[in-house]
Amino acid sequence: MTAIVCVSLLSEKAVLVKNLTDHVKAFYESIIGRFVSGPDTITEKRTMDSVIARKIVPSSTVILDGYGESFIRENPNATLMDIVTSSNNTAPKTTYQSIMPAMSALLGVPYVQGAFRHGIISKHGGKKTSLIILVVAPPSGFIRAASVGSSSSVVEVDSNATIKLDDTVGINSAMIKNTKLVSAAGLTAMGIEEIPIKCNSLDSLIIGWSMKYFKGYVDGYKSGVRDQATTILLNTPFKDLFVENGAGRMLPNDSFRVSESTIKNQVIEMGEGTKPDALISTHGDVFIDSEAVFTSDEQEKYRKDKDEEFFKKCVCNHIIAGDYGNNVIIIENPPHSDVRGLGVKYSFQVNKPELDGTESNGIKYYSKDTPQQIHDAILDVISDTNKSLLMNSKPIERTGKEAIAVCFKNGFPKKFAMVEMEKNGVKIVGMGDSPMLVLDNYPSMLSRAEKANRKSSRAKIDAPVVKIDTEDLDTNTLLDVIKKEVGSR
């Protein structure tokens, strides 16, 4: 069953309150429509026969509305953790690859890949810690055309939506007409039968990573390893996070603030000659210079007086205000009482007075020979600290042996973590990405159209195929099987 996947970002200041501009609202409503109530069954005439169609709600779609202001207003004592642990949060089976980017732009939030990266970076961060929520429910405007199978059964969902979700051409046109997005955020037209094929590897990537991280977030909370600021936010009732204004709108409660002692930011302390500007320019979505958020008055005063205490005070104030966001702060002399170091200081000095692993003020000191080696090592440390860190929607690539490209013939099993596979040198690729090995794993439930399309796609793969049942294998055993098969060829 087809689905649209939309990710909701929860932060201490917003619980999926969509900021749709006026010129987008009409388009948004034309897609989601409103569910039309009526009888549970519909009698439909087909030539000489009448078929009883049972109205059902699709179970494997992700709602576009999510939890908005009405939910907050109706559940003032609920918390973010109540949503996180909801049994409704299960992964959908398929994804509309072509619509996802447009929906993310329309709602003003990154879709799962971007949001996932954001969440990982902010997991150990401070005030603006964000959380991924996949809210599973049917979008009310979802329309599936009635069809008659061998059992003469018909499934149909009533809706007054003016745009069908399978009409990507219509959505594309409406997007261009009603939004300011260039080229409609990359929407492309495709037939319904093409979607499962084109989205197979994308599903595994996005849903697999998201749900693993999502479950890890909850597990971390239960085991007590969550940083204090995040724990507070997850368990604060909505009535404390939001207040209702005179116009009946739910707005962030500015008087609510996480205790300053719980707010931490990650920092990298770099020595002279390590070229932090190059690191910031290359990975601006991850790193930020400590002075980048200073006001003009603060910058002028610091450059004039060179007062280190004033500098530290400014850094702390901006951390508390959340001005650094979720970025890792590059700083020369961090105020250790108010920020948490990543555990590294890199410098290359002729005498190298600091031995690798030397610890001082909670920060370990290391030495490297060139700025590039320093930058590579820093990325390694961040990758180790945030196990699933994504940069530019791709995992950080480690230097060394080439990753083993593996294609799962019947889709990547959701029981495994794709991040863990890539961390151990196994890259999961799609049908047309020249895999080194194809695993004919336990077959999924496929329609006849899917089987036909998969058969034609597989014929193009020039790689050894190994039949394997992944049902009873753990990650380590599967990795051993893959490496053994590749090593023997």
From Swiss-Prot:
Keywords for the protein's UniProt record, in alphabetical order: Capsid protein, Host cytoplasm, RNA-binding, Virion
Q: Name the coiled-coil region(s).
A: none
Can you say where in the cell this protein is located? Virion; Host cytoplasm
Whether RNA-binding counts among this entry's keywords is yes
Segment RNA-binding: which positions? 129-251, 321-351
- GO MF terms held by the record: RNA binding
- Summarize the protein's role: Probable component of the transcriptional machinery present in the inner capsid. Displays dsRNA binding activity and may play an important role in the sorting of viral RNA and virion assembly. Together with the RNA-directed RNA polymerase P1 and capping enzyme P5, forms an transcriptional complex positioned near the channels situated at each of the five-fold vertices of the core.
The protein in question is named Protein P7
Organism annotation: Rice gall dwarf virus
